């Protein structure tokens, strides 16, 4: 049997890169951490770390065990929450703007599931305006969406600059209309971009319309036109196009349907408010 307490210590050592740093994080002595790792190596019958005077490195078996350890510890947490008195149950219809579904947001969903394994989610991904309307008519319980600056609906989670982006930032020829790749109406980023072009007196043409995130990115990467994009979510190889007018900002908010919130909706809302923020690796704004 592998002791879960030893696995927890090993994961901290692997993450921090050394016994001293792990001991500080765990609030214990370095000798205690080192001894726990030796006990774990004895239990699995493999050497997990290469040690020197400055740092520890994972062996191939150590790298494998880190992956297993995360799965084991996650499963233990779910089981403890299931049997340990967390009686939160229910069904949440949860709407999410497509650009928020980044590599980091699934970690929030996983954290929620670990804490509340008896709550079922009906996940709906789409345009912010559509999800807002579905929330207003009680088709969605909770929505994590964008709004324009100055709008009042929802609870602010974070805001971000909008930028024009494309494969490369070469200037357009004189009088050449700006090629725009966009979602169909009522996309907030589409409206922000077209309004900025109109204010600047620049002509434009909608060179590609798609209601799919992958299609939007593919068209921009292929050079079909420029997109309006949240700055903190800009993925390579797309780059900011500085010669086009500023499309402004977007605010990311939580919106709930009218009426009282269920405990499950409140728990998910609290988790997002405490943990969500600007993304550095992500997708295109919708």
Positions of the model-derived regions?
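Short helix-boundary/capping micro-motifs
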Residues: 11-27
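Central regulatory/effector-binding core of bacterial HTH transcription factors
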Residues: 89-150, 210
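Conserved amphipathic alpha-helical core elements
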Residues: 10, 40-41
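A late-sequence structural motif
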Residues: 244-286
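A short LG(V/I)-centered, amphipathic sequence patch enriched
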Residues: 41-58
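Secondary-structure junction motif
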Residues: 179-200, 262
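Beta-alpha-beta core module
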Residues: 151-155, 221-261
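Alpha-helical linker/hinge and terminal dimerization helices associated
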Residues: 43-44, 65-86
């Amino acid at each position: 049997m592998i002791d879960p307490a030893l696995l927890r210590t090993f994961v901290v050592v692997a993450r921090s890169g050394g016994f001293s740093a792990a001991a500080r994080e765990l609030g214990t002595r370095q000798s205690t951490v080192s001894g726990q790792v030796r006990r774990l190596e004895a239990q699995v019958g493999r050497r997990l770390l290469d040690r020197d005077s400055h740092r520890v490195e994972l062996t191939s078996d150590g790298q494998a065990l880190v992956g297993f350890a995360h799965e084991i510890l996650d499963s233990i947490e779910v089981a403890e929450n299931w049997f340990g008195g967390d009686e939160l149950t229910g069904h949440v219809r949860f709407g999410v703007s497509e650009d928020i579904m980044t590599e980091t947001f699934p970690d929030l969903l996983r954290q929620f599931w670990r804490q509340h394994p008896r709550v079922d989610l009906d996940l709906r991904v789409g345009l912010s305006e559509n999800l807002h309307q579905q929330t207003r008519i009680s088709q969605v319980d909770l929505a994590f969406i964008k709004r324009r600056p100055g709008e009042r609906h929802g609870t602010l989670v974070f805001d971000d600059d909008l930028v024009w982006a494309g494969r490369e930032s070469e200037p357009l020829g004189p009088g050449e209309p700006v090629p725009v790749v966009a979602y169909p109406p009522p996309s907030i980023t589409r409206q922000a971009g077209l309004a900025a072009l109109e204010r600047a007196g620049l002509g434009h043409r909608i060179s590609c319309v798609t209601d799919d995130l992958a299609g939007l990115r593919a068209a921009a990467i292929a050079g079909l036109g420029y997109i309006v994009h949240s700055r903190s979510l800009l993925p390579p190889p797309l780059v900011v196009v500085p010669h086009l007018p500023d499309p402004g900002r977007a605010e990311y908010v939580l919106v709930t349907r009218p009426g009282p919130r269920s405990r499950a909706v409140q728990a998910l809302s609290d988790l997002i408010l405490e943990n969500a923020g600007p993304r550095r690796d992500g997708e295109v704004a919708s």
